[in-house]
């Protein structure tokens, strides 16, 4: 039997979403360039989604998109658009309009199921360019994570080693997930889409043992020891 020419499969990709709050193209370009300079391994030439929910009706999509593209980023879609005129301009430019998913609300009255939480265990170093994804489970890494490496988990992430890469917990939208690390020096830390770049982590906790979680939807950090 001959193999079909194509095959559709589900997959997971890490995409940064840029929430634009200022319609001035030059301000947007400068702000993005500053972010890229701080985390070049994560953002340089990266694919991004532009969220335009914070923009007014008179926004020029052509000027805005050119400002983003001038930084070297690649726009792969646009979200948060409710203005019909802006939608038309985006569609004419050949980009898709995306709907950002939300984590399902948990029923307060529902009795939690007594099921064991799965855990993926990695005992070897995670090197630059590698991506580890723990689908529907927690992730434990007992070795170092190099810059340019990426850890993704739908659950919690534990790193018992030097963390220099990127860690994204609660990837499916669970805001109750946490990140635990014994030596925290990451390029990026994210929980349920809320993230910090390296320069946003308090200097007093860089290289130290720390726990990160969400409090009222805001990323927070606490010393472990």
Curated annotation (Swiss-Prot):
It comes from the Bacteria. GO terms for biological process: cell morphogenesis; division septum assembly; regulation of cell division; regulation of cell septum assembly. Pfam families: MinC_C (PF03775), MinC_N (PF05209). Keywords: Cell cycle, Cell division, Septation. SUPFAM superfamilies: Cell-division inhibitor MinC, C-terminal domain (SSF63848). Signal peptide: none annotated. The keyword Glycoprotein does not apply. Cell division inhibitor that blocks the formation of polar Z ring septums. Rapidly oscillates between the poles of the cell to destabilize FtsZ filaments that have formed before they mature into polar Z rings. Prevents FtsZ polymerization. Interacts with MinD and FtsZ. Belongs to the MinC family. This is Probable septum site-determining protein MinC.
């Amino acid at each position: 039997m001959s193999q079909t020419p194509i095959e559709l499969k589900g997959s997971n990709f890490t995409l940064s979403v840029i929430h634009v709050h200022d319609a001035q193209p030059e301000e947007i370009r400068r702000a993005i360039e500053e972010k890229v300079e701080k985390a070049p391994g994560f953002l340089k030439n990266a694919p991004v989604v532009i969220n335009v929910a914070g923009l007014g009706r008179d926004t020029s999509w052509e000027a805005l998109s050119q400002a983003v593209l001038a930084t070297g980023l690649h726009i792969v879609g646009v979200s948060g658009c409710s203005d019909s005129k802006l939608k038309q301009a985006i569609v004419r430019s050949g980009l898709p309009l995306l709907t950002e998913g939300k984590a399902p609300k948990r029923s307060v009255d529902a009795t939690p199921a007594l099921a064991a939480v799965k855990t993926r265990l990695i005992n070897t170093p995670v090197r630059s360019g590698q991506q580890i994804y723990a689908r529907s489970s927690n992730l434990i890494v007992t070795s170092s994570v190099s810059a340019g490496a990426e850890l993704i988990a739908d659950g919690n992430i534990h790193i018992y080693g030097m963390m220099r890469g990127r860690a994204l917990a609660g990837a499916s939208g669970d805001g109750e997930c946490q990140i635990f690390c014994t030596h925290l020096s990451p390029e990026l830390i994210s929980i349920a889409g809320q993230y910090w770049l390296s320069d946003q982590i308090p200097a007093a906790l860089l290289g130290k043992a720390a726990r990160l979680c969400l409090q009222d939807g805001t990323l927070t950090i606490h010393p472990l020891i």
